[in-house]
């Protein structure tokens, strides 16, 4: 364990530079830049809430906040694991030239996705603010208590889970490149098995609930 920690500390500046590089590359040609990390989930939550509340008639108080909370966590996991999966193969030329611990690359992708999610959390704060003011949704149904500060706990759980899964996928992808295509299909099914766009009472008492309980993202 000490050896891994020493190696991590040795390459922490490389990790920082790789994360900074990915941030610059992602928003390099964008006028709004990093602001899209806030606007994208905010706009998506508004569109999804309009569609599902008007066409599917889901009776969920403040559906936009319900959706945004779940989608931020799930999208972080999806982005982190998907990018970590191809990170070693994508950096093969660099790995062949100099010695760098291979786990640095999946770790960097997961941390980049985590940083991106932290910026996206601003969208959730904005949505809660406009709901509390009564601009959208129902302020009476929005009860904000001190327990909101515990939100970082599921975030950290998801971070550790994403890192572990990302490392496994990155190793498998080196030998079996088709795993990327299979994983994209799996994550789509995974999303629908996670109560993000529908309330739990829709599936309670059905066979689907038994499958959903096996889903780590459900908890």
Short names for language-model regions:
Residues 1-219:
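Hydrophobic transmembrane alpha-helices and immediately adjacent juxtamembrane helices
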